[in-house]
């Protein structure tokens, strides 16, 4: 009986590693988003219950001996969880970068605040975009999609097996980084163009009327232009999420 309980505890510990590693990168599962670390751990524990019998049947005790072979098992689980969390966090990092870029161009970087979603200092637009994307993520079934990926990863990469770090893996990571910057630039590009045109117009105005302090009007004017541009371009920028939401429901 004691040995069986010990095996179940070891299976629970192994099943907990991959969701925990996922939560360290995915903003929605961080302790700042859920309110407390204890609540986050409870949510992660509930995510491990569906896969607990599968891991128990794999006899994880056979991988754990006195030769520290369990270190390879833990390392593989952490790497897989980090990779899933990294891929899932790319859209959230992209919109936060886009918001910080817009606030930098309009001269409002002094108004940084703490974003509990990503647990870091961010700009006003970065916080707005992050919160907006969280809503879109939940209503479009994004959380269910992440959980499906997490559970299917145990089918293709069960505990004891890890990823193959070859040229294809490096190309995949490079593609994810490229996607991160592409999302950031494409999301903020309409507002960036408006602010660049506003700077050009203010520069010409300052050259024709040098006694007028155009920098006093620069930040309010660019802020208004950014807000109007975002209101117009939001339906197009989030078209993919709206389409996926319609398919899901």
Annotate the PLM regions.
Residues 1-249:
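Hydrophobic alpha-helical segments and their helix-loop boundaries in membrane
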